[in-house]
Amino acid sequence: MAASSRAQASVQPWLYGVLLPWHRLLLSLYFRRIIIYGFEHLPINGPVILAPKHFSRWDPVVLAVLSVEPLWFMTNANQFSGVQGWVIRRLGAFPVDLARPQVSSLRYAVELLRSRQKLMLFPEGGIVRDQPLRSLKTGLAHLVQQAETRTGESIPVVPIAIHYEPTATFRAKVTIQILPPLFLADYEQSDKKATLIALTQGLEGALRSGMQQLTTATPPQD
């Protein structure tokens, strides 16, 4: 493991367990209601990649309700300065430079999956509010391919739609839909690049469908 990856791995998310009871209380006080559909699609144990829509800075905080175990987050490197950086590292976040992603960040994510952790990545690469979903690049699919090569097992990718009503503000209603997991093997093509594109398109289609259900018609059924 590279030096930067070893430094990241030395920071354990011990604050996650300490703040867990207060986290639930904070959410119940701030938001009017949080509704979750599709819990049956969420693997109990890792390795797993959770791939949510990214609408707000609240997303990681809200989505942490999906697991009592620490969730590891790949987060924009500009969020890691000062006290904020100290806190979010100990909540399970690790940095990535979105403008120039480093190999060490990818390697660290692979090592987390090898350790059977739950990893949350926002496939849009940042907060997107002006459209239902930004077109996805193949970075997440590439990570899945690398992780499966290293672990020798299939890594489920779980699309997650999230909607705030009316928006991500005080007393908003939050609806989360966990969608069926995707597997790289189901998108196998004649060459590696085509396979990564196919998985990316599958993830994008699942997220678009999930977001459409949450924002237009009747909520999904349990």
Predicted regions: what is each one?
Residues 26, 40-41, 63-64, 85-86, ...:
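Short secondary-structure boundary/capping segments
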Residues 34, 69-71, 91, 117, ...:
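A structural micro-motif
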